[in-house]
Swiss-Prot record:
Similarity field: Belongs to the membrane fusion protein (MFP) (TC 8.A.1) family.
Bilayer-crossing regions: 13-33
Name under which the protein is recorded: Nickel and cobalt resistance protein CnrB
PANTHER family reported for this sequence: CATION EFFLUX SYSTEM PROTEIN CUSB (PTHR30097), SLR6042 PROTEIN (PTHR30097:SF4)
Organism: Cupriavidus metallidurans (strain ATCC 43123 / DSM 2839 / NBRC 102507 / CH34) (Ralstonia metallidurans)
Gene name of the record: cnrB
Coiled-coil residue windows: 140-193
One Pfam family per UniProt: HlyD_D23
Subcellular location: Cell inner membrane
Length: 395
C-alpha cells in the first residue's frame, strides 16, 4: 500500500516537471528566433557592398562654351592610335605655291610714292609704290623709237607694194621693205614688252611696284625717298587662301608615314586642328638631316599664320586601329581614379578609364571610352577644379 501511495504521489510531480521543462524548452526555442531575426535581415544588406560594389554616382559639371574659350580648354576626339605609333614633330606654317609673292623694283631709282602700307589688303594689279628711275625714261624712249621705226617701215612697205602692183619697182624691193617691216615690228614689240614687264608708269619716268596676287601685305621694307636697287625686295604679299604646314621628321620616320594618313596640327596656344598628310619628301636636307612632311588642314581655316611655328602629331602606318589614345593632359585623377571628361550638351561628365602606356605626351586608353568621343584635353584640370568646387549635378 505504501508503494501504491508513493506511485500516486510521484505522477503529479513528474507531470509538473514535464510541464515546466516543456515551457522552458518552448521559450528557449523561440528566444533565438526572435533575436536572430533582425540579424538575419540585416546581414544580407551588410554583405551587398562586398559582393557587388555600388558604383559612385557620376556628376556632370555644367560649363558654358564661352568659358571653354576663355579658359582655353580644348576638346578633341579620342584617337584610334596606339601609344608609340604617333610622332610629335616641330613644323612651320607656309604659304601654298603661288599664294605668296615677293614684290621687287624692276629698276633702280628713288621711291617717289608709297601707296600701300603693312597690313593693307590688296588686289592683283594694285600699285603699291612708284620708283622714279632714269632707266624708266630710257625704256620709254626705246619704246617710242621702236614704235616710230615700225610705223615708218609699214609706210615704206605699203608704198613699195603699191609700186610693185603698178609695175614700177621690182619684187626684190617690195620683199626688202617687207623684211624691214618685220624687223621693226619685232623691235617695237620687244621694247613694249620690256616696258610692260617693268610696269612703266604713264608719265614715262617712273616704274610702278605692282602686286601680282590678291592678299595682305605681310612685309614692307620701303621708305619714301630712299634709293632702291633693281630686284630689291620692297613688299611681301600673302594670299588669303589655304596654307600648308611643313613638319620636320627624321629619315627613319619617313618610312612610317604615308600620304593621306590623319594628322593633328597643334597651334602655339595648344588648340588642335584636324589635318592630313599631303606628301612626304624622299630626301633629307639641312644640317639637321631631316625630311619634310607636308600637312594640310582638313578644313579651311584662318587660324594658321604664314611663318608661325606649330607642332604636328603624325600617325604612323603601323598604328593599331583597335587601340585608343588621348593627350596625356586629358587624363585626370578624380577621387583616386583615372578619368576622362567626356563632352556633353551642357558641360562634361567624368568617365572612369583604364590607362595603359604613357609615352610621348600621349596616354593609351584600354577601356572606358570609345573612339571619336569628344573629351577635354588641354587644361582639363580646370574642368576637374570646377567639379571639385561642387558645380556638378548629382544624378
Amino acid at each position: 500500500m505504501m508503494k501504491n501511495e508513493r506511485r500516486s504521489v510521484n505522477w503529479p510531480m513528474i507531470a509538473g516537471v514535464a510541464a515546466v521543462a516543456a515551457a522552458v524548452g518552448f521559450g528557449a526555442a523561440h528566444l533565438p528566433v526572435s533575436e536572430k531575426s533582425p540579424a538575419s535581415t540585416q546581414a544580407p544588406e551588410a554583405q551587398k557592398p562586398q559582393s557587388a560594389p555600388v558604383k559612385p554616382g557620376l556628376k556632370e559639371v555644367k560649363i558654358p562654351a564661352t568659358y571653354l574659350a576663355a579658359a582655353n580648354i580644348a576638346v578633341e576626339p579620342v584617337a584610334s592610335a596606339a601609344v608609340g605609333t604617333e610622332i610629335l614633330a616641330p613644323a612651320t606654317v607656309a604659304a601654298l605655291p603661288g599664294s605668296e609673292a615677293v614684290i621687287v623694283s624692276r629698276a633702280a631709282g628713288a621711291v617717289q610714292r608709297v601707296q600701300r602700307r603693312l597690313g593693307d589688303v590688296v588686289k592683283a594689279g594694285d600699285v603699291l609704290a612708284l620708283v622714279d628711275s632714269p632707266e624708266a625714261a630710257g625704256m620709254a624712249a626705246e619704246r617710242k623709237v621702236a614704235q616710230a621705226k615700225a610705223d615708218l617701215a609699214r609706210k615704206t612697205y605699203e608704198r613699195e607694194a603699191s609700186l610693185f602692183q603698178q609695175g614700177v619697182t621690182p619684187r626684190q624691193e617690195m620683199e626688202a621693205a617687207k623684211a624691214a617691216l618685220d624687223v621693226a615690228q619685232a623691235e617695237a614689240l620687244r621694247a613694249a614688252t620690256v616696258a610692260q614687264s617693268a610696269h612703266l608708269a604713264s608719265d614715262g619716268r617712273s616704274v610702278a611696284v605692282v602686286s601680282p596676287i590678291a592678299g595682305k601685305i605681310t612685309a614692307q621694307s620701303v621708305t619714301l625717298g630712299a634709293f632702291v636697287a633693281p630686284q630689291a625686295e620692297l613688299f611681301r604679299v600673302a594670299g588669303t587662301g589655304a596654307v600648308q604646314v611643313e613638319a620636320a621628321v627624321t629619315a627613319a620616320d619617313t618610312s612610317r608615314i604615308v600620304a593621306g594618313s590623319e594628322a593633328t596640327i597643334l597651334l602655339a596656344n595648344g588648340s588642335p586642328l584636324s589635318a592630313r598628310v599631303q606628301a612626304v619628301t624622299p630626301t633629307v636636307t639641312g644640317s639637321a638631316r631631316v625630311a619634310t612632311v607636308v600637312v594640310v588642314p582638313a578644313q579651311p581655316t584662318d587660324r594658321l599664320v604664314v611663318g608661325e611655328g606649330v607642332q604636328v602629331r603624325l600617325r604612323t602606318a603601323v598604328a593599331d586601329a583597335a587601340a585608343l589614345s588621348v593627350p596625356e593632359d586629358a587624363v585626370q585623377n578624380l577621387d583616386g581614379r583615372d578619368v576622362l571628361f567626356v563632352r556633353t550638351q551642357e558641360g562634361f561628365r567624368p568617365m572612369p578609364v583604364l590607362v595603359g602606356t604613357r609615352s610621348g605626351g600621349s596616354a593609351q586608353i584600354l577601356s572606358g571610352v570609345q573612339a571619336g568621343e569628344q573629351v577635354a584635353t588641354r587644361n582639363a584640370f580646370l574642368v576637374k577644379a570646377e567639379m571639385n568646387k561642387g558645380g556638378g549635378d548629382e544624378e
